[in-house]
Amino acid sequence: MKILTINTGSSSLKFTLYKHKNTQILVSGTIEKIKTKKSIIKIKTKNGLLEKTDKHIKSHKEALKQLIRILTNKKLKIIENPDEIQGIGHRIVHGGPSFKNSTILNTNTLSELKKISKLAPLHNPIAIKVIEITLKIFPNAKQVLCFDTSWHKTMNENAFLYATPYSWYKDYNIRKYGFHGLSYSYITKRVATILNKPKEDLNLIILHLGNGSSINAVKKGLSYDTSMGLTPLEGLVMGTRSGDIDPAIIPLMSKLLNKTPKKIEEILNKQSGMLGISLKSNDLRDIWEGVKNNEYNSKLAVEIMAYRIKKYIGSYLAVLDFNIDAIIFTAGIGVTDYGIRELSLKGFEKIGIEIDPQKNNLARDKHTESDISSEKSKTKILVIPTNEELTILEDTYNLITKPS
């Protein structure tokens, strides 16, 4: 059985085609900078063949046409026609109150997904467009919606409710939902294997640090609390997102800058975070260069980011009763940036959480798992590359093979 996973971004399309029997990857790739004249297609085949092509891809529809050309390319020998693909799993950022688990795509679920898109206007609408196109391109494939919010369905009301009028929650579903759930699900299972401990016995703090970042407290193998909220804007300092702020800033800056609240929200999402503080870049690699050159704002950006992470780790240690099995760093920054890991855990050695500097310094490869805890550390500190696609694959396979 061949299953395709699709991860749609606002200007990108990430895909992996699996042969499910042994989770063999037949081809994977990304189509980046969609809607620009500098679009990039990167693919990697099962034989390790890497290709990079520059094209002008005007839309996600055109990107999907390119995907079909890649999959049916006779030289690559992946598939002969689209009907060979029996299942497609879509990563959906926001499932709102409607979707507690991954679900089969049908008329009803697509309709419900459209209704909740107002909760994620930056993410869900473009994913829906891609879904509607894939329904035409792959008419015979069963398709599945896999939600980043579903993992957090186990949070208690005291963790997910805001202290706003209760009617906002009951009437408008205003609450914390959390994100990066596909990643947290994979990491939790992986840690259970690494530590040789039942998943339901695990207490973890997982840091998904990338251009978008969040942190998850896992209690007895289930999501207990998380930093992102109603939207992915809440929580940690991110590449271009502010993370936690005083909400009164929005009407104040709207007045001072003579801009609409919607425009201020856009600034908080796209021009803030590391980019906003550093005055340089949303890319931490560029900011570290600034630190080396003694640039004040670059140093400040790194300090603010690490300080916010440290505060969240401390608070999650408290809600987990200071009883945790491991702290895990994952995603692009979490796996490669030893400096942020060191700063984020500085001081925790006093309560038995200690990094080994040499191991930490060596853990920079985005594909390699590492144990960076010192011999004295009472808590494991692990670096584990995430694999959201594998979570999508498993959920898709389980749903499309389930007896009706």
Swiss-Prot record:
Recorded hits in SUPFAM superfamilies, A to Z, give: Actin-like ATPase domain (SSF53067)
Where the protein is mainly located, per its record?
cytoplasm
Cofactor requirement: Mg(2+); Mn(2+)
Which residues are listed for Mg(2+) binding in this entry?
A: 7, 388
Q: Please give the biological process terms from Gene Ontology that the record holds.
A: acetate metabolic process; acetyl-CoA biosynthetic process
Task: Read off the PROSITE patterns from this record.
Answer: ACETATE_KINASE_1, ACETATE_KINASE_2
The places in or outside the cell where this protein is found are: Cytoplasm
Q: Where is this site: Transition state stabilizer?
A: 180, 241
Q: In which pathway does it act?
A: Metabolic intermediate biosynthesis; acetyl-CoA biosynthesis; acetyl-CoA from acetate: step 1/2
- EC annotation? 2.7.2.1
Where does this protein hold substrate? 91
Q: Which PANTHER family match?
A: ACETATE KINASE (PTHR21060), ACETATE KINASE-RELATED (PTHR21060:SF15)
| Family from the record | Belongs to the acetokinase family.
In terms of NCBIfam families, this protein maps to:
ackA
Name by which UniProt lists this protein: Acetate kinase
Q: Which organism is it from?
A: Borrelia turicatae (strain 91E135)
Taxonomic classification, please?
A: Bacteria, Pseudomonadati, Spirochaetota, Spirochaetia, Spirochaetales
